[in-house]
Amino acid sequence: MTSATPTSLTHPLVKLGLWLRDSGYRFVTPTPLTHARVNARDALEARNLRDIFGWSRPFKETLLPAPALIWLEQAGLLDHSGGLLASKVRFSSLGDQLYAHSAYPTTDADSVFFGPDTYRFANLIENEMAAQPLLPGARILDIGCGAGPGGISAALATIGSPHLTLADINPTALIFAQANVALAGMDGTCANSINS
C-alpha cells in the first residue's frame, strides 16, 4: 500500500493538473465513438489545451509552456512522433474536480478508462450519499478504482474526513488514482489489490 501523497510519478501529474485547473481547463469526456467522429472531422493537430488533454490530439512543442512539457516527460507521459508531441494522459472534469486518466484511444492493456459511464456512476454515488450519508470517520473502499472517481466522489460527499482506500490490480490505474486523490486535496491510500 502507498499513501496518496504525490510520488515521483504522480507529482508531475498533480502539478500538471493544478496548472490546467488554474488555466480554466474543463473537458467532459464523450464516448469513444463520439471522440473518433470529432477527431475525424476536425483538424488533427491540437490548437489549445482541450485539444491536447481532452481530444488527445498531437501538438507542436510551442503550444505548451516548458514546465508542462517537463511534467509530462517526468511522468513518462509524452510521446514524440513525426515532429509532433502527444500526451499519454487525458484530464476530464467531473463536478469541480479534474481527473487524470489514459489518453484516447484506450487500446493498451493497462489503459485507465473515463467516460460517460464514469459520470453516471459518480451521479449514482452522489445521489445515494445524499439519501443515506455516511457517518464522520467512515471508511470508503473503492475496489477496481481505475482513476478513482467513484471513491473520490463518495469521499467528497461525506461529512468530515473519511478514510479513503482506492484499490486496483492495474499499477497505471493506481498512479492516476494517487494523483487524482492529491488533486482533490484529500488524504487516502492506494493499494494493489493482489498484494495488499
Predicted features and spans:
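Class I SAM-dependent transferase core
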Residues: 85-130
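Short, Lys/Arg-enriched charge-dense amphipathic segments
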Residues: 51-55, 104-109, 158-164
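N-terminal auxiliary segments of SAM/dcSAM-dependent transferases
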Residues: 2-96
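Acidic-enriched, low-complexity/disordered segments with a strong bias for Aspartate over Glutamate
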Residues: 22, 42, 51, 79, ...
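Conserved SAM/SAH cofactor-binding pocket of Class I
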Residues: 117-196
